[in-house]
Amino acid sequence: MDIELTKIKKVYFIGIGGIGISAVARMFLKEGKTVLGSDVSDGEVVHELREAGIVIQAGQGIDLVPKDVDLIVYTIAIENYDPAFFTALQQQPIPIRSYPQMLHLVTEGKYTIAVSGTHGKTTTTAMIGHILRKVNKDPTMIVGSLLVDEKSNFVAGNSQYFIVEACEYRRSFLNINPKILVITNIEADHLDYYKDLKDIKDAFHELVMKVPEDGFIICNTSDKVVAEVIMDAKAHIINYLDFYHARELRIPGMHNQVDAAAAIAASVQIGVDQTRADIHISTFPGTWRRFEYKGALASGTQVYDDYAHHPTEVVATLEGFREIYPYGKKKITVVFQPHLYSRTKQLLEDFAKAFGQADHVIVLPIYAAREVDDGTVSAALLAEKITHNHVDARAVDSFDDALNLLLAHPFGPDDVLVTMGAGEAYTIGEKLLKKY
């Protein structure tokens, strides 16, 4: 059933607190549609949506779905973790679309700039948007995080440009037809869905082939995996390393320097002067949960939060912290929540080596999300593996145990505390700041 968005007046979102789907909810609210939703969790995004005036029910089930809506939008996670609900949803006499399908609808007919890759998608997407807004290109944006200045993952623009973060999970990004495709990097991830790296490369290759001859693919052509993926591309290939140099950025880390090069490369392809792009990238403030400063404890300990949940991201983030807090001057304690049993199991040895720049690591229980524990991997096993790599690490059974452990720790002005992971580790830092 085709959908004309202009005729849609009332929309119900299932899993509305998801960082991607919530952006579409904000977009529809901005357009004057009536937006309702539900979510099983009650995090920061849900709070922000309620503040914006969206009525959100707690929980999930077919009995919560209104009968008088014109469209139902759902998070693709329910297809796997709640198949009975998904089946019942499909039987409703109301059009339903997944979040990835909605990305196709909202970007249709636009000059779409899609940012893909295993790491750096959010920062690069936000950087491109920051540059284009500074030079009055007035883009619409959907970002996989809350922007610092707007406190939103959606920005409404009035131009042809639509910048969107393109996630590879379950081949979601194949719903998008980009004119400019940015590939930050390609590594093994989402191994609960993909069979292996080859399967991931096949998905990226399919995305590459969607970019037209007069389009652009921005990537690192010297990366062997990426080079294989773009081999048959019809579009113009732009090596973002040609735009790389050490810039003055407000956010530390070599990975952010690389993301900045990719953002500038993309901006230049649509007519932005490179010198102006360089000037504006220096004012980029970052995004929510990416090297985010949360505050200081009464003892003088600095508290940060970061979304890193893949070994490569953990390494890059800790290297960034060591740029500003060198060894011998500060001790870094990381409170890490592994994200997904499948990812932790498949990348266990890489995770074990990723915390080499930390002094202490506290491993929280694994964030299950859409998965079931099969007993083959645990926080305790990861902590043991980290210890074998000469970093002090211990696992805890609960968030409360972690909080009590931290409250008993003699933190001082020479300490830095970093909560890390894609789940809810950030709440530990927030609670500590309230207690101190």
Language-model-derived ranges and their functions:
Residues 1-98, 102, 252:
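N-terminal leader/targeting and accessory segments in enzymes
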Residues 2-10, 20, 27-31, 244-360:
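Nucleotide phosphate-binding/pyrophosphate-handling subdomain across enzymes
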Residues 3-4, 27-30, 50, 64-67, ...:
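Phosphate-binding loop of NTP-binding sites
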Residues 33-40, 217-221, 333-336, 358-368:
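Short internal beta-strands
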Residues 67-71, 160, 412-415:
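Short acidic/histidine-rich motifs immediately flanking catalytic phosphotransfer sites
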Residues 302, 352-413:
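C-terminal helical cap/extension that packs against the catalytic core
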Residues 402-434:
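A glycine-rich beta-strand to alpha-helix segment
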